[in-house]
């Protein structure tokens, strides 16, 4: 691994949530040159854990969250603060424009470049698809033509999610999160554009960039009630820190169809700024959406990360 510069202790952002110390004493021994993967639901303290590991043992914090890549979302995505990013090496945070598309394939290529730097990676985030692509490989699925994407957008809007699910092949429907409109639409587009189900394409996956056996993989499994309280408290802190202004800055080019528009809380606060709902209703809806997202994350991690070392919280 490459030699690292000395650095000062990392500061803490106004809305950063720490991880209780006791569960961390149960961590496995991690060699200083071994890659670390940290997955966990939103507001579970995974970013604080990643920063602590890099501060104590060296390396670079690498983002594995699909929304923290966008430059327009620092507060709503709970991206590390500018001071935190300056205090420790960070990669793949806030480097993608709001109107750009960004997929697991884009992320995987950029992670490959980070691994080539030679610093020990501590890869942290809540996007399960990124971790599975990294440790299991990612199928080379053809790009969706714009006309198929437009057809899918119209189909979802007119017929609804349930109808789109019914039109998927059985093998794919059994493997993806059918409650996630983005995942369902992507699978529908692949089938429509190629005539083959997403599951068939995934069966031809290339070897993984970082096999699970070559890393220390940690998954945070928090108590749901404890996590729900943290989610609500963190959103209040985000609002106090300027999240509404952050959303206001995106209004001129706001497009709900963009991947960046999936940031939890953004659609709700946009609705308020457009005079459609009062602020307290927008905040309540954003908190609910965040808790629902955390539940979907916990389900993914429980089903797909059974070989990962568990960190039970609190």
UniProtKB/Swiss-Prot annotation:
Region Disordered, annotated ranges: 1-24
Record's keyword annotation contains tRNA processing: yes
Membrane-spanning residues: none
Site (Interaction with substrate tRNA): 127, 149
Example GO BP: tRNA modification
Binding-site positions, substrate: 42-47
Pfam family, one: IPPT
UniProt keyword ATP-binding, yes or no: yes
Cofactor (UniProt): Mg(2+)
Listed Gene3D superfamilies: 1.10.20.140, P-loop containing nucleotide triphosphate hydrolases
Functional summary from the UniProt entry: Catalyzes the transfer of a dimethylallyl group onto the adenine at position 37 in tRNAs that read codons beginning with uridine, leading to the formation of N6-(dimethylallyl)adenosine (i(6)A).
NCBIfam families: miaA (TIGR00174)
Quaternary state and interactors: Monomer.
Protein name per UniProt: tRNA dimethylallyltransferase
Organism (species): Cereibacter sphaeroides (strain ATCC 17029 / ATH 2.4.9)
Lineage, opening ranks: Bacteria, Pseudomonadati, Pseudomonadota, Alphaproteobacteria, Rhodobacterales
